[in-house]
Amino acid sequence: MTASVTTSVTAHPTAPAPASQRPPADQDGADILTVARREVLDGGRGLDEAGVLAVLRLPDETLTDLLALAHEVRMRWCGPEVEVEGIVSLKTGGCPEDCHFCSQSGKFDSPVRSAWLDVPSLVDAARQTAATGATEFCIVAAVRGPDARLMAQVREGVAAIRAAVDINVACSLGMLTSEQVDELTAMGVHRYNHNLETARSHFPNVVTTHSWEERWETCEMVRAAGMELCCGAILGVGESLEQRAELATQLAALEPDEVPLNFLNPRPGTPFGDLPLVEPRDALRAIAAFRLAMPRTILRYSGGREITLGDLDVQGMLGGINAMIVGNYLTTLGRSAEADLKMLAELSMPIKSLQATL
């Protein structure tokens, strides 16, 4: 781990300054791109925190070259294939945690209300996901961690899906005990999602009901049990560029199989409901920077890409991304699966179940 937890909490976080207002990078654009080409493209070694920060500080005029390099890295170390995933909310709303970006928290005055999905509906959702060509289906629950009732529902749902649908089943159920990790592994859960969300130094500004270290501990248990680990980020929650670089290298140190990149889609009633969207060019720079930090990892487009990038999302596919969620998210709308599959076909990027080459 590369940074210590801060003791002060900022009441009103602000977005990073636009590129035109930022201090110059420690290295000029040509230098860091040369370093990245040698170390990452040729050597397969991710950039360190200083290198990632230099990339995030690059001016707009270098963006085309940066994205091209990140795409080269993705093609060399991951290949042209794209992993497609669908997600479904087994248990929506009423979460006791206070993640400031999330409308499913029971602590905020958001329009999301608690609801459960039954097992036949889970199987139907998995079947619809598989029909798109997707190879991954993730069952998500808005909880701190699963209780006995939820684990029983997941056990039944995973068994029913595996019996009826040819698709990998993943889960995202919050923080786990070692016994729950072992139980999910025994069920045949393919991959477990638990995001770090933001840099360790910024985490107290985003969540106060649990610690960054608790999240890290669950991730380490998942890896130790032999399940694939999906662990990512949400960008635009008031973090600085320095903290984005910190997060990228903390994720790299964890060595997840997959890193989903979310961009804040401000939700009414949440503490971050009035934060600005990440600027599209900054989002693309971040995608490239995370690819250059983790050249061999599955890097997935996740929530917020539509509202953040719009039609520029194709640039992310040509700038380091090699996986995506299709269809809707947990409480927000995504692009149609048909539109995303058409984009992949036009880019000649075949759909395939992926493994990180760590």
Swiss-Prot record:
The keyword 4Fe-4S applies. [4Fe-4S] cluster binds at residues 95, 99, 102. InterPro entries: Aldolase_TIM (IPR013785), BATS_dom (IPR010722), Biotin_synth/BioAB (IPR002684), Biotin_synthase (IPR024177), Elp3/MiaA/NifB-like_rSAM (IPR006638), rSAM (IPR007197). Residues 80-305 form the Radical SAM core domain. Keywords: 2Fe-2S, 4Fe-4S, Biotin biosynthesis, Iron, Iron-sulfur, Metal-binding, S-adenosyl-L-methionine, Transferase. It catalyses: (4R,5S)-dethiobiotin + (sulfur carrier)-SH + 2 reduced [2Fe-2S]-[ferredoxin] + 2 S-adenosyl-L-methionine = (sulfur carrier)-H + biotin + 2 5'-deoxyadenosine + 2 L-methionine + 2 oxidized [2Fe-2S]-[ferredoxin]. GO terms for biological process: biotin biosynthetic process. One of its GO terms (molecular function) is iron ion binding. Its cofactor is [4Fe-4S] cluster; [2Fe-2S] cluster. [2Fe-2S] cluster binds at residues 138, 171, 230, 300. Homodimer. Catalyzes the conversion of dethiobiotin (DTB) to biotin by the insertion of a sulfur atom into dethiobiotin via a radical-based mechanism. This is Biotin synthase 1.
